[in-house]
Swiss-Prot record:
InterPro entries linked to this entry: Aminoacid_DH-like_N_sf, Malic_enzyme_CS, Malic_N_dom, Malic_N_dom_sf, Malic_NAD-bd, Malic_OxRdtase, NAD(P)-bd_dom_sf, NAD_malic_enz_proteobac
Protein name listed in UniProt: NAD-dependent malic enzyme
Subunit composition and interactions: Homotetramer.
Originating organism: Shewanella loihica (strain ATCC BAA-1088 / PV-4)
Key word Transferase present: no
Annotated binding of NAD(+), by residue: R154, D267, N415
Protein family membership: Belongs to the malic enzymes family.
Pfam family, one: Malic_M
E.C. number: 1.1.1.38
Positions bound to a divalent metal cation: E243, D244, D267
GO BP annotations, alphabetical order: malate metabolic process
Length: 562
């Protein structure tokens, strides 16, 4: 128990205190607290420490036979005793992150309605569009500072999961707390229930969402506008993270709101920031610059294009022109290499399309320039997969890349594991252990000829908790591109590979607290420099980060009257 902090004064007692996850201590209530809060007889006699509770919980956790059951068990602890939940994650973060988030959370989303047990967060349904203010006021969390919101249309690589997508905001906010030290009392997951186009859900008698085809067009835009305005009225200083919106909505929503509210899209900007940070670390280890690389993408959706734009911005900051940087980036989708004469390019793709004149002399084997054609002609040194389609990084493609690049950098980032473009084991075997590999989902280390290769997980959890902490500590009113670039550079500075040629590309998850604080400082400093936050010295900013960093310790309680 943290005796250095002042006690919390609570106006209620008895079973009510045991049913409030944010304040429940279970068997850790002291004898004095049990008397004052009318808890005598409601708990077993023994008074435990949080570590004793966590030890029992971990023993129970290990007895479950599959990851989904482990996920459900951990969620039950979260809905019963949040402090214990986060102590358990703190003690076993590497083991449990794949359980509370990707890849297991994908299965939890698919089975959300079937496994539903208890409310968490807010569901705002389109039929209730005129009562959004009332719905927000129904939240028991009064000081919300970070919101993760989804409409469930593009959940990981699984597509439309309707309200089942709520598993993503819940899981994401668990990482804000366990990795970034954001108090769970300041977090709120929200799902915008605008219907679903998933026929399996519409026909499922257990589906708990609004049974209707998804709304779109002006109806959708007006609903999201009403939501954003209502959130700003209720919690004007809250950071809003857009999560798993479909491509057709993700970028337009970000463009519409990024200069009006404190918000960002993790799929576009968070993924870009962690990818750029990982690339910077890889380049530092090779004593080169990102601006010297030639980069091929498989997948030209909003996430892939967001990463590409962030890479180009970093290249330009290193001294090359925007035009030159764009010539070094090759975007490939199902129709082949994006070229500026293609019809129906989306707005965010147009500036990333290669000029036809630059590639018309290429020796190609297909009418549309394929990824393999790009390997032979463009000779990329970096390959990034955000296609959501498994197995597309074939042996032929990887070996073609390796013929012109001794140490290729290969990031198959698609989630969940079942959607990855190639496994690290295959990539390392095909390149004889020479590739630098990072993935979007967790993979076991690979052993080749008695050498073990740790596989870095290029996971947004390295970035967004630090961004959230930096925004909260500095009081930033916006999330700018420069703040995101600062987060990438800060992550690269934490890379073990930069200090040791045999080290991992990304830090160990056990070091995530120090990484998040380092990123938070970089983000907050840029926010202050840009005028998005009030002036503060480096010392004051660092102190604010420490003051806002929540740890999973019980507080002392005192009783007060209503």
């Amino acid at each position: 128990m943290d005796d250095n902090k002042r006690p919390l004064y609570l106006p209620f007692a008895g079973p009510a205190i045991l049913e409030a996850p944010l304040i429940n201590k279970g068997s850790a209530f002291t004898e004095e607290e049990r008397i004052f809060f009318n808890l005598e007889g409601l708990l077993p006699h023994v008074i435990e420490t949080i570590e004793e509770q966590a030890s029992r919980a971990y023993d129970q956790y290990k007895n479950f036979g599959n990851d989904l059951d482990r996920h459900i068990y951990l969620r039950n602890i979260q809905d019963t005793n949040e402090t214990l939940y986060y102590r358990l994650l703190q003690n076993h973060i590497t083991e449990m992150m794949p359980i509370i988030y990707t890849p297991t959370v994908g299965l939890a989303c698919e089975r959300f309605s079937k496994n539903y047990r208890r409310n968490r967060g807010l569901f705002i349904s389109y039929p209730n569009k005129d009562r959004i203010d009332d719905i927000l006021n129904n939240s028991t969390r009064q000081k919300v500072k970070i919101i993760v919101v989804t409409d469930g249309e593009r959940i990981l690589g699984l597509g439309d999961q309707g309200i089942g997508g709520m598993g993503i905001p819940i899981g994401k906010l668990s990482l804000y707390t366990s990795c970034g030290g954001i108090s769970p009392a300041y977090t709120l997951p929200i799902t915008l229930d605008v219907g679903t186009d998933n026929p399996h859900l519409l026909e499922d008698p257990m589906y708990m969402g609004w049974r209707n085809q998804r709304i779109g067009g002006e109806e959708y835009a007006e609903f999201v506008e009403a939501f954003m305005e209502a959130v700003h009225r209720r919690w004007p200083d809250a950071l809003i993270q857009f999560e798993d919106f479909a491509q057709k909505n993700a970028m337009p929503l970000l463009e519409r709101y990024k200069d009006r509210y404190c918000c960002f899209n993790d799929d576009i900007q968070g993924t870009a920031a962690v990818t750029v940070g990982s690339l910077l670390a890889a380049c530092q280890a090779a004593d080169s610059k990102l601006s010297q690389q030639r980069i091929a993408f498989l997948g030209a959706g909003s996430a892939g294009c967001g990463i590409a734009e962030a890479i180009i911005a970093q290249m330009v900051s290193e001294g090359i022109s925007d035009e030159q940087a764009r010539q070094q980036v090759f975007m490939v989708d199902r129709w082949g290499l994006l070229q500026d004469n293609m019809p129906n390019l989306l707005p965010f793709q147009q500036n990333l399309a290669q000029q036809v004149a630059k590639v018309e002399g290429w020796n190609t084997e297909s009418e549309n320039i394929s990824l393999l054609d790009v390997m032979h002609n463009g000779k990329p040194t970096v390959l990034i997969g955000v296609s959501g389609a498994p197995g597309l990084f074939s042996e032929e493609i990887i070996k073609a890349m390796h013929t012109h690049c001794e140490r290729p950098i290969i990031f198959p980032l698609s989630n969940p594991t079942s959607r990855v473009e190639a496994t690290p084991k295959d990539i390392l075997h095909w390149t004889k252990g020479q590739a630098l590999v990072a993935t979007g989902s967790p993979f076991e280390p690979v052993v080749i000829e008695e050498q073990t290769y740790e596989i870095a997980q290029c996971n947004n959890s390295y970035i967004f908790p630090g961004i959230g902490l930096g925004v909260l500590a500095s009081g930033a009113k916006r999330v700018s591109n420069e703040m995101l670039m600062a987060s990438s550079r800060a992550l690269a500075e934490c890379s073990p590979l930069a200090k040791d040629g045999e080290g991992s590309l990304l830090p160990a998850l056990e070091d995530i607290h120090s990484v998040s604080k380092h990123i938070a400082f970089a983000v907050g400093k840029v926010a202050i420099e840009q005028g998005h936050a009030l002036p503060a010295s480096d010392e004051l900013l660092m102190q604010a980060i420490e003051d806002n960093f929540w740890t999973a310790e019980y507080r002392r309680y005192k009783r007060t009257s209503f």
